Curated annotation (Swiss-Prot):
E.C. numbers: 2.3.1.274
Coiled-coil annotated spans: none
Quaternary structure note: Homodimer. Probably interacts with PlsY.
Subcellular localization, as worded in the UniProt entry: Cytoplasm
Gene: plsX
A cellular component term, taken from the record's GO annotations: cytoplasm
MF-aspect GO terms: phosphate:acyl-[acyl carrier protein] acyltransferase activity
Keywords: Cytoplasm, Lipid biosynthesis, Lipid metabolism, Phospholipid biosynthesis, Phospholipid metabolism, Transferase
Catalytic reaction equation(s): a fatty acyl-[ACP] + phosphate = an acyl phosphate + holo-[ACP]
Record protein name field: Phosphate acyltransferase
Length: 344
């Protein structure tokens, strides 16, 4: 499969706004990006969505039956519904009929399907979800991982997260020399719980990881770090808190601006600024999180994703495929491969 024409399997039935917004984002991606899109799901619903967006061009549809609902336990759901859209999409990658999967559906089901269908990369004990957030420096983002795949971690897992994050930052985000930090309660090497202390020692000894020290919560969005490593419990809380703060900030601006600068006139003048602020803070701009460490490219988008977010998720998938992120991770892990033993 050529790097300039990646084939992306899109779970058309996953997400709060499926299939309409999923299809809309996929159609735009096919038109504007050098990708082939395979829409996976109910053919009738997908055809209806394509027609709704006045798109008469032929698009490849891969039939699937059903979806893993949000209330379902992930592992039992994917085993009970082998023809569910996320399972079919993952199988396309496994069988080399697609290069990547994009899904805004049940994130737990997507992770479980990826592990069962694609498997882990050699040398990776626990895959991680990487999420990209904006920073105070315009045009610069920070990659945080893990943000939900592993609530309990060992130091060795965090070392692997740091390796994967370094590669992602270099080849997908375009950072020549990523600065990697360990999320902690203080900058000093002696700070933190047992996991943080032992992880710090491992990271500073690994010459493949450009580790620069601990990152406090206030540093996350400062632009000081390109990659921040933490366990999935802390990372998930951090991610959702950051999203909530962004939404609150935008809402406050919407409410307060009409009260000053002569009301509606002032608001109209500031609309371009507000649009730029929203663009910098909106998670839709980054498309979703890349599940790093599985034998394939898998983008897990926000459940509330609409067309712009799906478009960006497909763009992200294409970049990961074109830059051979999975192969680069596997090559790096060969150089530091050590079995995980109790306590590490």
């Amino acid at each position: 499969m050529g790097a300039t024409r990646a084939r992306i399997a899109v779970d058309a039935m996953g997400g709060d706004h499926a299939p309409d917004q999923i299809v809309a984002g996929a159609l735009r991606a096919r038109e504007e990006l050098e990708v082939e899109v395979l829409l996976v799901g109910d053919p009738d619903q997908i055809h209806s969505a394509v027609k709704h967006h006045n798109n008469s061009s032929a698009i490849e549809i891969v039939p699937a039956e059903g979806v893993i609902e949000m209330h379902e336990e992930p592992l039992s759901g994917i085993k009970r519904k082998p023809r569910a859209s996320i399972n079919v999409a993952m199988n396309l990658v496994k069988e080399k009929q697609a290069d990547a999967v994009v899904s805004a559906g049940h994130s737990g089901a997507a992770m479980a399907a990826a592990l069962l269908r694609l498997g882990r990369l050699p040398g990776i004990d626990r895959p991680a979800i990487g999420a990209v957030l904006p920073t105070l420096i315009p045009g610069k983002a920070v990659l945080i991982l893990d943000v939900g795949a592993n609530v309990d971690c060992r130091p060795k897992f965090l070392e692997q997260f740091a390796l994967m994050g370094t590669i992602y930052s270099q080849y997908v985000l375009g950072v020549e020399k990523p600065q990697v930090g360990l999320l902690n309660i203080g900058e000093e090497e002696c700070k933190g719980n047992d996991l943080a202390l032992r992880t710090y020692e491992i990271l500073k000894e690994n010459t493949q990881i450009p580790f620069v020290g601990n990152a406090e919560g206030r540093d996350v969005l400062s632009g000081q770090f390109d990659v921040i490593v933490c366990d999935g419990f802390v990372g998930n809380v951090l991610l959702k808190f950051a999203e909530a703060v962004g939404e609150v900030a935008l809402q406050i601006l919407r409410e307060e601006l009409p009260r000053g600068l002569h009301g509606q006139v002032g608001t109209a003048l500031l609309k371009p600024n507000l649009r730029r602020i929203k663009q910098r803070m909106d998670h839709a701009e980054h498309g979703g999180g890349l599940l790093l460490g599985v034998n394939g490219v898998c983008i897990i988008s926000h459940g509330s994703s609409q067309a712009p977010s799906i478009f960006n998720a497909i763009r992200l998938a294409k970049e990961a495929v074109d830059h051979q992120v999975s192969d680069r991770i596997q090559a790096s892990c060969r150089l530091t491969a050590n079995p995980v033993v109790d306590g590490n």
